[in-house]
């Protein structure tokens, strides 16, 4: 494998040229280092706000930014980084990351521990002719079927009908989602925002991400994105309370206690719809978000459900001649025929015995009858002589 990229070590990570021929360009402020790893992947909060539209709803912009995480099968973080688009060559970050012989291809080829790729993008991936992001992602996953991909985005890119490529992008998203469970597509919302802020954004005061994570406008936009991606991919999203599922063990308990005291926390399902009349700065900490299935969860079977246990026995293998020998009697005749003949002989002997007994009984009865008749005749003769 001859890599297309060049990587340089820095004090807090690495910087990568996705294509070795890139050079400093006046048309692109990020050239030539569009991929950054480690702590080099952090961006200022102002840039994050303008790119991802957080904490307010998104608005049209041309910059593409993708954060990524590479994790092992147990969920341990192997590498984190970011990729930015190139305005000079009109290349999207997903196209750079999933390029054949590109940066991710080389990493996974040399490190078999990487099993999960998680992307956090401000735009959903597209498949337009100048970028082919989804096509490259699809081919990448075909080469690494043991690797899963989870894509989270803050807004859909060119899927509305007013864009000429909308139908093509929707069909490409549907095809990528068909690789489920290897691939999941979800809107960023709830606790995922908090995770991104803590991992990839710099210049945030302590406790801001937990106490003031959402606004009503951001909440409605996240729900709309989840609904739209569900309609496009026809894959039903699953929701959970992300603030609890994403809570880290070393999180400051006082910060979480402050968030739990908010009036909108732990609301009932009937109260999930936010009140638009409230202050836009009110944190919507009750937001339900798609659950990220990394690291994979192995659910044990229910103890109440019976399990079918199949035991395989090794039977004795006999040759055909031995099988025939076992089936025959010592006299060399088939067992079934010999038993049938013995049974018929016994029945004939029993019949002969019964016949002889019946004949003897018949003769005895006949002799008794004859004696009785003779006696009766003698009695009749005596009576007739007396009457004369």
UniProtKB/Swiss-Prot annotation:
The active site is at 94 (proton donor). It holds the Pfam family NAD1. InterPro entries: APOBEC4, CMP_dCMP_dom. Residues 60-176 form the CMP/dCMP-type deaminase domain. Zn(2+) binds at residues 92, 126, 133. Its EC number is 3.5.4.-. Its cofactor is Zn(2+). The keyword ATP-binding does not apply. Residues 322-356 are annotated as: Disordered. GO terms for molecular function: hydrolase activity; metal ion binding. Keywords: Hydrolase, Metal-binding, mRNA processing, Zinc. It is an enzyme of class 3 (hydrolase). It comes from the Eukaryota. GO terms for biological process: mRNA processing. Belongs to the cytidine and deoxycytidylate deaminase family. Putative C to U editing enzyme whose physiological substrate is not yet known. This is Putative C->U-editing enzyme APOBEC-4. It comes from Rattus norvegicus. The gene is Apobec4.
